[in-house]
Amino acid sequence: MKRIGVFTSGGDAPGMNAAIRAVVRQAHALGVEVIGIRRGYAGMIQGEMVPLGVRDVANIIQRGGTILLTARSQEFLTEEGRAKAYAKLQAAGIEGLVAIGGDGTFRGALCLVEEHGMPVVGVPGTIDNDLYGTDYTIGFDTAVNTALEAIDRIRDTAASHERVFFIEVMGRHAGFIALDVGLAGGAEVIAVPEEPVDPKAVAEVLEASQRRGKKSSIVVVAEGAYPGGAAGLLAAIREHLQVEARVTVLGHIQRGGSPTAKDRILASRLGAAAVEALVGGASGVMVGEVEGEVDLTPLKEAVERRKDINRALLRLSQVLAL
């Protein structure tokens, strides 16, 4: 294999640039050329491709976002669109791909493998941490720390005004961010999609906190934990609260910013491992880190098997929220 492509797709995640850097430099060490594909699958269809050398990826390890940009592509969802993308890859002389992204990215990559025989190795880049086959995904640690900093600041104003704050974090289908941020931030309640949320039970927890002398509380809500997110949950229990309550949606701030050391190291390790796997003949797999070791998981398994939250941590958070 003499020439490979690398692209980012779906939602951006801090550390993607560190992964791109690792792909390019590991490939260079193996004598393999790298072509950067801009704007994900949309750019692949349009042939938006640029050569990437070792100097092209200098000074990006600390940058958030992705220098290759990312986009969603409706056209790639069709067989005709994927055929166009494959034709562009062939025309560019690309013999294999490193796909950096989440489950949507990997589902698209699987189509290229199954329909056109294009070798693809995936690198897990998503703040949601919801991919099976890796303990952590690139961007998760940064998102947690970004959200935690915001919650620490909100707790200050919550205490000053003796209010309850319902804070919404990202996670439509997975509660990894909410759980880690909630536990680290000392939240009184953590609402995640993996567990049914009973508004009455939430109100009872907050009322019990008030009886114990608490004048302010934090409720961390994953966006998919309850219909309408944090605002929907507050609306369902507002009449039961004896204190003022506010909603804060952290939103896309969780995706941005300079990646943490942990994310930079993970991205560097997995980006390099993806190149080694691809050049070594692997395809249709995702590189991940499991118990400190690099592991390969079939892409199909990575997106279809459910990765569960640590329910022991959820129970611990309930014990500690006194």
From Swiss-Prot:
**So where does ATP get bound?**
11, 72-73, 102-105
Q: What class of enzyme is it?
A: transferase
Q: Does the keyword Kinase apply?
A: yes
Name the pathway it acts in: Carbohydrate degradation; glycolysis; D-glyceraldehyde 3-phosphate and glycerone phosphate from D-glucose: step 3/4
- Co-factor requirement: Mg(2+)
Residues binding substrate? 126-128, 163, 170-172, 223, 246, 252-255
Q: Which GO cellular component term is one of those annotated?
A: 6-phosphofructokinase complex
- What does the record say about activity regulation? Allosterically activated by ADP and other diphosphonucleosides. Allosterically inhibited by phosphoenolpyruvate which induces the dissociation of the active tetramer into an inactive two-subunit forms.
Q: What domain of life?
A: Bacteria
Q: Say where the protein is mainly found.
A: cytoplasm
Going by the UniProt record, its keywords in alphabetical order are: Allosteric enzyme, ATP-binding, Cytoplasm, Glycolysis, Kinase, Magnesium, Metal-binding, Nucleotide-binding, Transferase
**Which residues are involved in binding Mg(2+)?**
103
What pH dependence of activity is documented? Optimum pH is 8.4.
Q: What is this protein called?
A: ATP-dependent 6-phosphofructokinase 1
Gene symbol?
Answer: pfkA
